Curated annotation (Swiss-Prot):
It catalyses: Release of an N-terminal pyroglutamyl group from a polypeptide, the second amino acid generally not being Pro. GO terms for molecular function: pyroglutamyl-peptidase activity. This is Pyrrolidone-carboxylate peptidase. The gene is pcp. The keyword Hydrolase applies. It comes from the Bacteria. The keyword Transmembrane helix does not apply. Removes 5-oxoproline from various penultimate amino acid residues except L-proline. Homotetramer. It comes from Treponema denticola (strain ATCC 35405 / DSM 14222 / CIP 103919 / JCM 8153 / KCTC 15104).
Amino acid sequence: MKILVTGFDPFGGEKINPALETIKLLPNEILGAKIIKLEIPTVIGKSVAKIKDMIEKENPDVVLSIGQAGNRADISVERIGINIDDCRIPDNEGNQPIDEPVVKDGPAAYFVTLPIKAIVEKVKAGKIPASISNTAGTFICNHVCYGVAHIAAARTAQGKPMKSGFIHIPFLPEQVIGKPALTPSMSLEMIVKGIELAIEAIVQNNSDIKVSGGKIC
């Protein structure tokens, strides 16, 4: 099995992105699966294009994208990507699309095809907080979540099955210095361990487990 793991460069005035720092520290193999690491730009269009180029080069079985979400306190496993770019801030090249589709005439949304509940349970069993998230936002993270899912759906229809998904991670402790009190953070060591456990769950579970992971609202 080949798993392509992507992480963004810093954005929004930050000097570091925990997603990129995390993928740098992942081992090259987890439970026999080859781990391919890719830095991607926090740029509409170019982020997905760079992933697509690597997919065509490596033909991975899975693409797992990692992104920073400064308001999250745990390892947040996304359930769905939606076909909308509605950017509150510009990307790293100044693009700020508002109410534009990620893919013109594409489906309204894609559910991710990774075993999200198995991932959450595996991470929590490792003493690391984790949960299902039902929104990846409307910035670059959702753009990538949806865009890669669209690529995966097309490849699967062509007889080249590929799964994809997205995980949001918190700020690192050094990033919250000077930010409002109680801004959540997580150590890089814990994030890396959480992502390693997530990948183990992907390798071990071809289909998802049946446990509750929903929310009332």
